[in-house]
Every structure is written in C-alpha cells, then in structure tokens.
Amino acid sequence: MAKFATQLFLLTASVVMLEVQSSIVIMQDPDLGRKLIMNPANGASCGETCFTGICFTAGCSCNPWPTCTRNGLNPESI
C-alpha cells in the first residue's frame, strides 16, 4: 500500500509541475507588451471591413470605420 501511495503522490506532483510550467510559458509571451500598449481606438486589423457597421470576428469592433480592429486591451485579443 505504501508503494501505491508513493506512486500516486509522484503522479500528482508531476501534474502540478506541468501546470506551473505552462502558466510560466503563458506569462512570457513576447507580444504581451505590444498587445497591452496598443491604442484601443487604433488596434490591430481583424482582416475584414465593416461596411454594414458590424464585425463578425470575435473581439473586433468597427472603429475606426470601415476597418474592423481588435482592441489591444481586451482579454480576448491577448
């Protein structure tokens, strides 16, 4: 029984370590600084136009018209 408990502990510890490593990788995004300082009114292009006043890409808005842009401060764009 002690051997099983040790193996279970090691398995759990390895899963926790993988979670910690993946969260560190996310925080080291080289584009994060660029995305955070983008002007919300003049963000990155979403690749579509909004002649009808609507953008179909998630996280994009029709500002400035007629180009859909993504707000660099929205969590969806990060």
UniProtKB/Swiss-Prot annotation:
There is a cross-link at residues 43-71 (Cyclopeptide (Gly-Asn)). It comes from the Eukaryota. Disulfide bonds join 46-60, 50-62, 55-68. Keywords: Disulfide bond, Knottin, Plant defense, Signal. Residues 1-23 form the signal peptide. The keyword Disulfide bond applies. InterPro entries: Cyclotide (IPR005535), Cyclotide_sf (IPR036146). GO terms for biological process: defense response. Residues 24-42, 72-78 form a propeptide. Pfam families: Cyclotide (PF03784). This is a cyclic peptide. Belongs to the cyclotide family. Moebius subfamily. Probably participates in a plant defense mechanism. The presence of a 'disulfide through disulfide knot' structurally defines this protein as a knottin. This is Chassatide C4. It comes from Chassalia chartacea. The lineage of its organism: Eukaryota, Viridiplantae, Streptophyta, Embryophyta, Tracheophyta.
